[in-house]
């Protein structure tokens, strides 16, 4: 009988990550180091452990708005080419060390121009850092493919410019577009021009929707904006009636989301921190998985949530009793939903993900 997944063995499993914010995944030591180099004096702590603890504690706020406040510090130390390159390089290293074989990492270029960099400078530097990180990881025997999503802040008015940026860099490592930030009062339909531009150029995009706000945000993202994926989308559970015996009935919105196989970029630990759910055990991930939605496992912000893909998977295993076949399905779901070309997705699934999961399950295909 195949042994149940443990944290130690999960660390060996290949992973595909679709929802990870570059400015939410810095190493605490890097934040301190760059802050010293650039003269940023507003950090809440000057010790690595104390700073890591502050980010973690501050992010357990119970609201999305308060959860986003610590980003002012990470963004402040990501304003120079040297800092952006380093953060991107280390991001690739950290993900590869956790056996992530494919990642789409997102960031908002508009947050990194306060020291005079242009949008193109920012994106080019980050992509260069990712490429160098990929090369270093391959040399260390931990190959990873890292691609980029450029994000527009939903409370600002730069989404069309950022969409154009995505198209300019589409053959250089940017595979899609996103909008992020506080949902309440900032519906995705305010950015229709950007989404139409992406569709006009046959490009892919995801939308943060259904995280802190409810079904209207999801409906707009799908029906009016045409999102290829949903960032979080956890509130779709509000359109599912669950019986006392565990049976369920999908509402119209939930049904179309499932029927169209629109991927959900679920981030369990982050959802607990922002108050979207009370605990991992109460997270609707398992309900959505049993209902055969295309669920994927993601980190969101590794620094703020003090997490990794392995930890996210292990927490789900502990909460819902998942086995290797479940983790393999969630991983294949993510790889199927990636924004790279079909043949590249298939190659990673068939040549990397399936064989390595088969080995972990004690048999070969």
Swiss-Prot record:
SUPFAM superfamilies: Metallo-dependent hydrolases. Gene3D superfamilies: Metal-dependent hydrolases. Disulfide bonds: none annotated. The record marks 232 as: Important for catalytic activity. NCBIfam families: aden_deam, PRK09358.1-2. Catalyzes the hydrolytic deamination of adenosine and 2-deoxyadenosine. This is Adenosine deaminase. It comes from Mycobacterium tuberculosis (strain ATCC 25177 / H37Ra). The gene is add.
């Amino acid at each position: 009988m195949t042994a149940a997944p443990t944290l130690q063995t999960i660390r060996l499993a290949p992973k595909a990550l679709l929802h990870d914010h570059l400015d939410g995944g810095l190493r605490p030591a890097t934040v301190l180091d760059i802050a010293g180099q650039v003269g940023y004096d507003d950090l809440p702590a000057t010790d690595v452990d104390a700073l890591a603890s502050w980010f973690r504690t501050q992010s357990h706020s119970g609201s999305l708005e308060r959860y986003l406040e610590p980003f002012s510090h990470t963004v402040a130390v990501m304003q120079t080419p040297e800092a952006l390159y380093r953060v991107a390089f280390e991001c690739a290293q950290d993900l590869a060390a956790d056996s992530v074989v494919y990642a789409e990492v997102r960031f908002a270029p508009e947050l990194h121009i306060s020291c005079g960099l242009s949008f193109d400078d920012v994106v080019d530097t980050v992509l260069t850092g990712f490429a160098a990180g990929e090369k270093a990881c391959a040399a260390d025997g931990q190959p990873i493919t890292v691609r980029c999503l450029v994000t527009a802040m939903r409370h600002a008015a730069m989404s069309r410019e950022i969409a154009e940026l995505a198209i300019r860099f589409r053959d250089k490592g940017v595979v899609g577009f996103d909008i992020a930030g506080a949902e309440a009062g900032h519906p995705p339909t305010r950015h229709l021009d950007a989404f139409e531009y992406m569709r006009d150029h046959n490009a892919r995009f995801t939308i943060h929707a259904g995280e802190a706000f409810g079904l209207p945000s999801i409906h707009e993202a799908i029906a009016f904006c045409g999102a290829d994926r949903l960032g979080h989308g956890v509130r779709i559970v509000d359109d599912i009636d669950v019986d006392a015996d565990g049976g369920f009935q999908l509402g119209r919105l939930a049904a179309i989301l499932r029927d169209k196989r629109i991927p959900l970029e679920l981030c369990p630990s982050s959802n607990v921190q922002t108050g979207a759910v009370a605990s991992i055990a109460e997270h609707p991930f398992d309900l959505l998985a049993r209902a055969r939605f295309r669920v994927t496992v993601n980190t969101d912000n590794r620094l703020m949530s003090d997490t990794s893909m392995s930890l996210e998977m292990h927490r789900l295993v502990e909460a819902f009793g998942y086995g290797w076949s479940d983790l393999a399905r969630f991983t294949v779901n993510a790889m199927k939903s990636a924004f790279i070309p079909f043949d590249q997705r298939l190659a990673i699934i068939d040549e990397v993900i399936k064989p390595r999961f088969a080995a972990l399950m004690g048999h070969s295909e």
